[in-house]
Each structure stands twice: as C-alpha cells, then as structure tokens.
C-alpha cells in the first residue's frame, strides 16, 4: 500500500444511527461501504416518484434533482452529506448501494429512478453518447460481435477509468445490475489507486504526464479524438488517472511499450477487489482514484446480464484534474 491514504474506516459515520438507511463496511474492503435503504424508505420513495416515468426524467433534467431531494428528505437529510463526504474521501470513495424490495428486472424503471436520485445528490450525470441519454442500459450475452470489450463475456474487461475519450470531467461512475440470467462469474473488479503496488514507479515515470491521443470505436458515437495524459494530480497533488487500454493510441515505440507495461502492472495487482453485485444493487465510485473492470463469465447459451451506467461530475467541492480536462 502507498502512503497516500491509509485504509481507515470513518467510525463516526459507521457508528451513527441513520434515518432511512444502514451503513457498514463491505465484505471486500473498508474502503468500500455498503449502504442499504430500508424497505419503508424504498416503498415511500417509489410511491412519491411514481408520477414521473423515466421518460419524464429524460426530458426534464430538473426532475432528476427533484427525486434526489425526495430521497434525501426520506432519509432525514442525512443521505446527501454522507454520499458527498464518502465519495470525496480519498481513503474511501466507493459505495455498494441497495434498496430493500428492489431486486427484480420487472422493477427496471424503479432501479433507474433510484440510481438517478442518488447520483443527482452528488452532482449531475453527463450525456452518454452511446445511448443518447443521461444513462445507458446495455446487455451482455453469450455471443458478442461489438467493437469493444464492454459486452464481451468470456474475457476479463481490464481495469480502467471512464471518461477517457470525452471532454467532460468524469468524477463519478455508477454501475447498476438490472438483470441476470444463467450467470456464473462476472464479478466487478475494483482497484483503489493508493493500493496499487506500482503506483509510484509509473506516476513518476517521464511518460506519466505526457499528453497522449485517445480515440473511441464507432459504437461510442464520439467522432473526435481527445488529448490528455494518463496521470494527473488533484488539488492536493495526489495522483489521479484517466486510463483505458482499449482507447489510448500510442504515437511511437516508447509510448506503446510503457503503456503495455502499465497494463500488465494493473492487471497483476494483488489488491484488486472482486465484488459481486446482485440484481438491483449498484456501485458508485470516485472515478479519479478508483479503477474498475469485470471478471469473465462462465459460458452458457442463454447467458444474459443487463446493466445501467451513469457517469458525471461532482457539483460540490471536488478534486478535479488540474490540467488537461
């Protein structure tokens, strides 16, 4: 572990009695907290937001904040400050969130509403060019012919940050499980940057801050390249990353070899967390210092997993990238 942040649970938040939800360290790491909305909170929230279908949230963006306020009010206005504090805390920065009573694909619209409410208590979800909305839903099946590893089930999707090929700052990533059938394997993989054994050697390398070209495949619906380094710093000078192996375009031998070594060093880390995410639950992580990926699935002809993602910016004091945004 690096000296940047020790793994130390925020005992004040964990010991506090919360209204409408429970909070505890996850089974995988004290950096990852498990937040669960009570059955009563879930029931009241869904009742109060039933008047707005997801289409209304798509068309009227202010409603996303409205339903966030409804959820926070049901939690005694304790939810929003806790979410912000946790996600901005370098020693944590990650939550596994669930709601009692939401656990079936038939509740897909309710899942989108809940995730939207939570995300818009911390900031705003960016436009997703792949879907044309502020969120994207996509399916992983046993056979895939797409142009990236996003939907390919029988290989590991390597650790990466989101937002590497867009201009918008991507502070957070939300990943929700909507459906799962005939599934074995496929856990989410997480690595906190400060737990990466090779951070210092790569962050101090001459290529760490070199501006590189990033280009997305056609399925992402992004027509122009962006330019930024792999590493940057936050407002306190701590390392942050914007990296994905599929979309970085090394210009020469030196960059290509270094990026290959970087990829190998990430994938062989002994501190990668393997996190099962059941239907109805979602991960919410700080994208600046957490990398995420997905383990491989066991093949099955009727394999199906549906996911929903949102990614966006913090609307409150945050450690944005200092350069090359």
Swiss-Prot record:
Segments passing through the bilayer: none
Per its Swiss-Prot or TrEMBL entry, what cofactor is needed?
Answer: Fe(2+)
Entries under Gene3D superfamilies matching the protein: Clavaminate synthase-like
UniProt key word Metal-binding: yes
Q: Name one GO molecular function term.
A: glutarate dioxygenase activity
Domain of life assignment? Bacteria
Residues of the signal peptide = none
Q: Does the keyword Oxidoreductase apply?
A: yes
User: Which enzyme class, named as a word?
Assistant: oxidoreductase
Q: What is its EC number?
A: 1.14.11.64
Pathway assignment reads: Amino-acid degradation
Q: Quote the catalytic activity from the record.
A: glutarate + 2-oxoglutarate + O2 = (S)-2-hydroxyglutarate + succinate + CO2
Q: Which cysteines are joined by disulfide bonds?
A: none
Return the cofactor note field: Binds 1 Fe(2+) ion per subunit.
Q: Which CDD domains match?
A: CAS_like
Against InterPro entries, the record matches this protein to: GlaH, TauD-like_sf
Per the record, the GO terms for biological process are: L-lysine catabolic process
Q: Which Pfam families did the record assign?
A: CsiD (PF08943)
Q: Which UniProt keywords apply?
A: Dioxygenase, Iron, Metal-binding, Oxidoreductase
Enumerate the residues binding Fe cation. Answer: 160, 162, 292
Subunit organization: Homotetramer.
Please give the function described in this protein's UniProt entry: Acts as an alpha-ketoglutarate-dependent dioxygenase catalyzing hydroxylation of glutarate (GA) to L-2-hydroxyglutarate (L2HG). Functions in a L-lysine degradation pathway that proceeds via cadaverine, glutarate and L-2-hydroxyglutarate.
Q: What family does the database annotate? A: Belongs to the glutarate hydroxylase family.
Checking HAMAP family in the record gives: glutarate_hydroxylase
Full protein name: Glutarate 2-hydroxylase
**Source organism:** Salmonella typhimurium (strain LT2 / SGSC1412 / ATCC 700720)
Name of the gene: glaH
């Amino acid at each position: 572990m690096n000296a940047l942040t020790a793994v130390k649970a925020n005992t004040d938040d964990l010991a506090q009695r919360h209204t409408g939800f429970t909070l505890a360290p996850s089974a995988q790491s004290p950096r990852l907290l498990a937040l669960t909305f009570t059955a009563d909170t879930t029931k009241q929230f869904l009742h109060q937001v039933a008047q707005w279908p997801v289409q209304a949230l798509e068309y009227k963006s202010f409603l996303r904040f409205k339903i966030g306020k409804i959820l926070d009010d049901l939690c005694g206005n304790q939810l929003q400050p806790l979410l912000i504090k946790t996600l901005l805390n370098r020693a944590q920065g990650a939550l596994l969130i669930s709601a009692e009573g939401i656990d079936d694909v038939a509740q897909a619209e309710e899942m989108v509403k809940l995730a939207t409410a939570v995300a818009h208590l911390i900031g705003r979800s960016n436009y997703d060019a792949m879907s044309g909305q502020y969120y994207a839903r996509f399916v992983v099946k046993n056979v895939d012919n797409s142009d990236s590893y996003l939907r390919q089930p029988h290989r590991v999707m390597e650790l990466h940050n989101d937002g590497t090929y867009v201009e918008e700052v991507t502070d957070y990533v939300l990943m929700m499980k909507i459906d799962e059938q005939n599934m074995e394997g496929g856990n989410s993989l997480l690595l906190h940057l400060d737990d990466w054994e090779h951070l210092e050697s790569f962050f101090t390398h001459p290529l760490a801050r070199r501006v590189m070209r990033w280009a997305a495949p056609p399925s992402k619906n992004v027509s122009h390249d962006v330019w930024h380094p792999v590493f940057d710093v936050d407002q306190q000078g701590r390392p942050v990353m914007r990296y994905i192996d599929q979309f970085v375009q090394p210009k020469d031998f030196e960059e290509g070899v270094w990026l290959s070594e970087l990829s190998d060093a990430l994938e062989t880390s002994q501190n990668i967390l393997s996190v099962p995410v059941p239907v109805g639950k979602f991960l919410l992580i700080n994208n600046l210092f957490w990398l995420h990926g997905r383990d491989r699935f066991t093949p099955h002809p009727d394999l199906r997993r549906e996911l929903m993602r949102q990614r966006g910016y913090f609307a409150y004091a945050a450690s944005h990238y200092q350069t090359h945004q």
